[in-house]
Design a protein with these regions (language model features):
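Short acidic/polar alpha-helix capping motifs at helix-coil junctions
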Residues: 14-20, 35-43, 179-180
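Generic secondary-structure boundary/loop-capping signal
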Residues: 28, 88, 102-103, 214, ...
Length: 289
């Protein structure tokens, strides 16, 4: 074994399990606390604004500018009370990652600073689309793109930033992200399904779509990661031995979860619960981890 590899193994084995986000409260006490959900909308918005958001989510109704200003003000009030200082339109471009540009709530006028967030800033941002879906040679003014608020997904706070789930389209309205095609397919499915359901019940206006969540991940110690140029450059294994196929290392579905992995899972669960993400099961995947 090379000296570099041995040093990486020694460093990895010296790392102890460590928790960073420890909550003593029951999950029900902090579930969704960082999400601007329906309950918080009722608290911070007027009934008119609340009804406008519900109509936009359920039936695709447009939100007029005056109501958008009220919604933005309510979001800003809630977010600043939670310690947020910036906001961003968060979207998933075709690069397979996320993209965002953080803007401050703070505005200075006559030497005085105050927080401001308008409806126009909530509804749309105008970023540079020349880098999507890949780095291009176009001038930025020749590649306009627009991120637009998607009210189907609730806004949330992450690292003192109000994250606004958004879609990303070109100047001509073409989809430049992963979400627009999904929303269009949901709309098409709802339209077709509603026509069928109306044969039995005329009161049905739309059909909603639900999907189950499953997230797999592989955890690699930082020392071992730094010893693998294939992981650093390609984000995948290119070199090395074939993995164990017969589960000799007890890396099966019901295998014991290592202490450091379990500590990571608990931290992940704590933050996920605060974002209103329901989690049910912890287990080893059927692969070396």
């Amino acid at each position: 074994m090379s000296t570099f590899r041995q040093r990486a193994l020694d460093e990895a084995s010296a790392h102890a399990a460590e928790r960073f986000f420890v909550e003593k409260r029951p999950v029900s006490a902090y579930f969704g606390e960082n999400v601007f959900d329906l309950a918080k909308m009722r608290k911070y918005m007027s009934q008119t604004a609340y009804d406008a958001v519900i109509a936009a989510v359920k039936f695709g109704k447009k939100i007029d500018r005056a109501v958008a200003n009220e919604i933005a003000s309510a979001m800003k009030t809630w977010a600043t009370e939670k310690g947020a200082t910036h906001y961003t339109h968060l979207f998933q471009p075709l690069t397979g990652t996320t993209a965002e540009k953080h803007e401050s709530f703070v505005t200075v006028k006559d030497g005085q600073a105050f927080e401001r967030f308008s409806g126009s800033a909530l509804v749309q941002q105008e970023p540079d689309a020349s880098s999507f879906p890949s780095g291009g040679l176009r001038n930025t003014f020749e590649a306009r793109g627009y991120s637009a608020w998607d009210p189907n997904s609730p806004v949330f706070i992450l690292d003192e930033t109000l994250c606004i789930p958004s879609v990303f389209v070109s100047y001509t309205g073409e989809a430049l992200d992963m979400k627009v095609p999904n929303l269009r397919s949901i709309q098409a499915l709802s339209s077709a399904a509603t026509s069928v359901v109306n044969l039995f019940d005329k009161s049905v206006k739309a059909v909603s779509v639900n999907v189950g969540l499953e997230q797999e991940y592989f955890l690699v110690d930082e020392a071992l990661y730094n010893a693998r140029p294939d992981l650093k450059l390609c984000d995948r294994t290119v070199i090395g031995h074939t993995s164990a196929k017969d589960q000799q290392l007890s890396d099966h579905y019901f295998g014991a979860i290592p202490s450091r992995v379990e500590a990571f899972m608990k931290d992940f669960e704590t933050e996920a619960y605060k974002l209103g993400i329901q989690l049910q099961t912890r287990h080893n995947e059927v692969a070396p981890n």
